[in-house]
């Protein structure tokens, strides 16, 4: 094990000098023994000097400190021992529940599976959330992105998806908290504990207060644990909150390493870094990884390079809209902007496909008529258009739904609506079977039966 010494410290970037014939490889993990800190090699500068990124706080480091090369990349424990535990980027427990028992450790840097090992799946995962199941269904082994600006409900929608799928799902789940609030990580842990599914979930946290090197690697640590379960012939759910913070950590690291920034100040390696992560989140013939990723949209601009780069990797995109959130409709999913590769008659069936398209057609027509209504009022519309507006407003309200995870805030018990009920209900609304009910009856209910009951009390 070769040793070197620190020659420069600039925030999270630390230069270490080794003997020329013992220069560490890129991605090797180095140990600063005295400070108990792990560094990861990012660049070889020459003359035995390597530039590294710290995985923890660099407070208290000084020049001349001894650094040991482990001759291997950062490795994390995989397997059953990680279930029910909270780990950091290095796979060390941070839940004060003793050491993690493991039989295997894996490097967090892995090559994606070979092309001939990949497997496709068209089996639909039922989420119990009406708007998701109807407009943007997702498949087992698929990748789903939850896009939204600040405060439109990404984390709550993701928690509901975890609640609904992880409880029904017999396999294991891995949750990677990348640069998010520590409070949310804490809430999530207790939510899982309360739901009795903690023994099927591995948690890896690198929250907002961590240095950029930590946040850049914590998604890979979580993914490595998920790959471990997949290679044991299991179906795994992988949740990442938030992919944007992964990109942002890359931007910080890139600037610290002195790279020239590209568009909007992002790192020049944005597409490559995103690809390295996303290409590994895939299903093979042994098992599947179904991933749900929250993606923060800076200033509600979907053309920003970070969300735009993420789009190309996903099978389904759930776009949360501030305009819909302002109407008090939650989940604030935009049914005209959200898409899914699975919304195909060959996958979901003709009935589901036609109902979803009919719903979108009615909502699109309502959107076009809004300007006319604003200027001239409802009375100037034709009878046909008046009907469309009436149905669209009912559909819009019926797309709202009380969540199980939000019950503590709203006092409304959460509702799980089966896919069959969802399709039948929307089909009936589009066909005008509920034209006689007031639109308020459709707001924040589960099934159509509840809307009928609610109408009686109005």
UniProtKB/Swiss-Prot annotation:
PROSITE patterns hit by this protein: ATPASE_ALPHA_BETA
E.C. numbers: 7.1.2.2
Enzyme category, top tier: translocase
Keyword Cytoplasm (UniProt): no
GO terms assigned for molecular function: ATP binding; ATP hydrolysis activity; proton-transporting ATP synthase activity, rotational mechanism
Reactions accelerated catalytically: ATP + H2O + 4 H(+)(in) = ADP + phosphate + 5 H(+)(out)
Subcellular location: Cell inner membrane
Keyword S-adenosyl-L-methionine listed: no
Binding residue positions for ATP: 148-155
Keyword annotations from UniProtKB, A to Z: ATP synthesis, ATP-binding, Cell inner membrane, Cell membrane, CF(1), Hydrogen ion transport, Ion transport, Membrane, Nucleotide-binding, Translocase, Transport
Any single Gene Ontology cellular-component annotation: plasma membrane
InterPro entries per the UniProt record, alphabetical: AAA+_ATPase, ATP-synt_VA_C, ATP_synth_F1_bsu, ATPase_a/bsu_AS, ATPase_alpha/beta_chains, ATPase_F1/V1/A1_a/bsu_N, ATPase_F1/V1/A1_a/bsu_N_sf, ATPase_F1/V1/A1_a/bsu_nucl-bd
Family: Belongs to the ATPase alpha/beta chains family.
Quaternary state and interactors: F-type ATPases have 2 components, CF(1) - the catalytic core - and CF(0) - the membrane proton channel. CF(1) has five subunits: alpha(3), beta(3), gamma(1), delta(1), epsilon(1). CF(0) has three main subunits: a(1), b(2) and c(9-12). The alpha and beta chains form an alternating ring which encloses part of the gamma chain. CF(1) is attached to CF(0) by a central stalk formed by the gamma and epsilon chains, while a peripheral stalk is formed by the delta and b chains.
Job description of the protein: Produces ATP from ADP in the presence of a proton gradient across the membrane. The catalytic sites are hosted primarily by the beta subunits.
Protein name: ATP synthase subunit beta
Organism per entry: Francisella tularensis subsp. holarctica (strain LVS)
Source species taxonomy: Bacteria, Pseudomonadati, Pseudomonadota, Gammaproteobacteria, Thiotrichales
């Amino acid at each position: 094990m070769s040793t070197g010494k620190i020659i420069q410290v600039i925030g999270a970037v630390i230069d270490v000098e080794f003997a020329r014939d013992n220069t560490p490889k890129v991605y090797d993990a180095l140990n600063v023994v005295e400070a108990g800190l792990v560094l990861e090699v990012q660049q070889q500068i020459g003359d035995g000097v390597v530039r590294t990124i710290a995985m923890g706080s660099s407070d208290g480091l000084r020049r001349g400190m001894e650094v040991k090369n482990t001759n291997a990349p950062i490795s994390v424990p995989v397997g059953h021992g990680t279930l029910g535990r909270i780990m950091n980027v290095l796979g060390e427990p941070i839940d004060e529940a003793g050491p993690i028992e493991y039989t295997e450790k894996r490097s967090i840097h892995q090559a994606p599976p070979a092309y001939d090992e990949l497997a496709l799946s068209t089996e639909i995962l039922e989420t119990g959330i009406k708007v998701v199941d109807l407009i943007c269904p997702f498949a087992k082994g698929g990748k789903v992105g939850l896009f939204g600006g600040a405060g439109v409900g990404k984390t709550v929608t993701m928690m509901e998806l975890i609640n609904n799928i992880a409880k029904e799902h017999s396999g294991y789940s891995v949750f990677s908290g990348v640069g998010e609030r520590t409070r949310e990580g804490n809430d999530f842990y207790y939510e899982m504990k309360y739901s009795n599914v903690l023994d099927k979930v591995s948690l890896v946290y690198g929250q907002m207060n961590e240095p950029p090197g930590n946040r850049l690697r914590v998604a890979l640590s979580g993914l490595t644990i998920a790959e471990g379960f997949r290679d044991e012939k299991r179906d795994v759910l992988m949740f990442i909150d938030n992919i944007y913070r992964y990109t942002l950590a890359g931007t910080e690291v890139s600037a610290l390493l002195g790279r020239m920034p590209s568009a909007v100040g992002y790192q020049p390696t944005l597409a490559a870094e995103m690809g390295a992560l996303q290409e590994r989140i895939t299903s093979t013939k042994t098992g599947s990884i179904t991933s749900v990723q929250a993606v923060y949209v800076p200033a509600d601009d979907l053309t920003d390079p970070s969300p735009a780069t993420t789009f190309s990797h996903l099978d389904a995109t759930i776009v949360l809209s501030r305009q819909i959130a302002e109407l008090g409709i939650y989940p604030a999913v935009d049914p005209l902007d959200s898409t899914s590769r699975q919304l195909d008659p060959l996958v979901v069936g003709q009935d589901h496909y036609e109902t979803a398209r009919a719903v979108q057609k009615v909502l699109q027509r309502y959107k076009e008529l809004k300007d006319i209504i604003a200027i001239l009022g409802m009375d100037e519309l034709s009878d046909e258009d008046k009907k469309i507006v009436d149905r669209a407003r009912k559909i819009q309200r019926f797309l709202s739904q009380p969540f199980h995870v939000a019950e503590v805030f709203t006092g409304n018990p959460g509702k799980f609506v089966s896919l069959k009920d969802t399709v039948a209900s929307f089909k009936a609304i589009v066909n005008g079977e509920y034209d006689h009910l007031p639109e308020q009856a459709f707001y924040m209910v589960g099934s159509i039966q509840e809307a009928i009951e609610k109408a009686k009390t109005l």
